[in-house]
Amino acid sequence: MLTELLAARPDFAPGRWVPCPPVRDRAAWDTLPAFDRWLYAGGQAARDARHIPPLPLHLWLDFTHTGNRARYEHAYFARRRLLCRLVMAECMGDTGEFLPPIADLVWAICEESAWQLPAHNSYVRDMPQLPLPDTTRPVVDLFAAETGALLAMVHYLLGRALDSAMPGLEKRLTGEVERRILRPWEREHFWWMGNGDEPMCNWTTWCTQNCLIATALLHPGSPRRIRAAVARAAYSIDCFLKDYGEDGCCSEGAQYYRHASLTLFNALEILCALAPGVFDCVWQQPKVRNMAEYIAHMHVAGRYYLNFSDCSPLAGVRGVREFLFGKRVGSIPLMALAAADFAADPDPDGLHHADDSEGINLYYMVQIAFGEAEVRAFTASGAATPGDIWYPSVGLRVCRAGAFVAGIKAGGNADSHNHNDTGSVTLYKNGQPLLIDVGVETYSKKTFSPRRYEIWTMQSCWHNLPRFVGDGAVYDQHDGARYTAREVQPLEGGLSMDLAPAYGAVPGLSCYRRTARLTDAGLTLCDETDYPGEVRLTLMSQQPPAVEGTLVRFGTLAEARLEGGLLGLETEAVSITDARLRLAWPDTLYRTTVRFTGRLQIQIG
């Protein structure tokens, strides 16, 4: 798409991308709604910055030695969060008060041996990480690119002030971004840049967005480098877009929307500024609009989203970036969702996000600051709640009826951030989780390794799916492109599919037909199979189940009535101790196991 548009205008006159008014434009900065909030946050950040979190070698090696990512990343991200807050406060106040701690943090980041994370320290996709970084050959990963964009924004906003206060620091800053980000991006090929038919993921647009920010702000007067950056970015984005269906569904789940579709939005905005008139028509492409609106279709109510793969049910709060994306593609529903979320958000600047990796992108903060007034003034006249939708590219059906919202996943087990969850169903009633997808634990060395499916949350037996028992064996789903649902048929208010292929070769199993339908009365789940032995169906819930014969009560929220070849029911409490899971769930979840043969129908309402 983009490379074709660029081929028609190869000699375009480069434009300039301006992320926000310069700090000297006091009329623009002094009237921002966030003015006082950022001055207060800057004071706290200045106190915290008296002790910059250290990044010693033993923390870097923690990933290699123990598989733990969190300890190094906590300190790494804390440095960048402090820098962002101090820069925003200095831009608001424009007094020089925050320049000394800003300089200390810039210097500390420039002194780091590597900007990539230990978990990303490799040059070949899906290969084991190297124990130590090679300082002569930087790796451009997600957060190296984030760091480059952050320092480029510091240069744009405060470069002159920093150089006046600390002569030579500005040269060091720009030199490190050039050496660690721009030259490698221009001269080497990292897997996320795209290579023909090779599958891409959110890394592609996320890294590309940040490399474009760094190029645009460090080399605004270099037509040669701007043109080369535009061409490189256009190719990468095309490689990313090829993996999306026309329906715009994100196979990585709603939580990755902000890292995939929203970074696509920003990358396209920058490209449109750098290459005036070349890419403007992309905003009218149905695929791009569908990608924008995906998050609105996945929204349940309040903070909850339909989730699968590595996605949490708490997939983030919508805000200014979503609003601007919706505005660009003409989506009133997306603008309305973003405006409502932003208005209700007690932390619109993202200062207290539980995810360490959030709050480190200075451009996002500028977007929020300068977009806040428009978002708060928006009135959602004509905005309607999204209806049912079928995403054939991923095999996802979203249905709404009365008090209920259901997500029914067909597809297969080769998604990016895959879990073995083909055929699973999630269900909400009155905006509360009823049948749940647990999500993913804190990332570790095992998460993205050949041992991934040893992690319990990845396994089909911890999703709302069957397992098959026979001859002393228990059969669960397998991971890989060949393990899919077949004969998938979208129905009014539901979906029908055969799940047998997702399990591979199970003796005696050739068909497991699941039909799920949602009405105002609730969800009807009908499973029929030719498997001759016992089937054990998992039902995961947040509400404690109470079994009364063929009735299961899920707290006071709902009840399930079972009929068919029922053999028995068992319930168990599942202790939740992982920090990432505890962000979404209480300390105990529940698994109900329904044992049956032949046919089972469950009416949940």
Segments predicted by a language model, with ranges:
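Non-membrane alpha-helical segments in proteins
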Residues: 78-92, 104-108, 145-153
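Extreme N-terminal leader/anchor segments
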Residues: 1-38, 88-91
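Cytochrome P450 core scaffold surrounding the K-helix E-X-X-R motif
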Residues: 435-447
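Solvent-exposed loop and edge beta-strand segments that line ligand/cofactor-binding
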Residues: 67-79, 91, 128-145, 187-205, ...
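Carbohydrate-active enzyme catalytic cores, enriched for enzymes
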Residues: 261-262, 266-434, 595
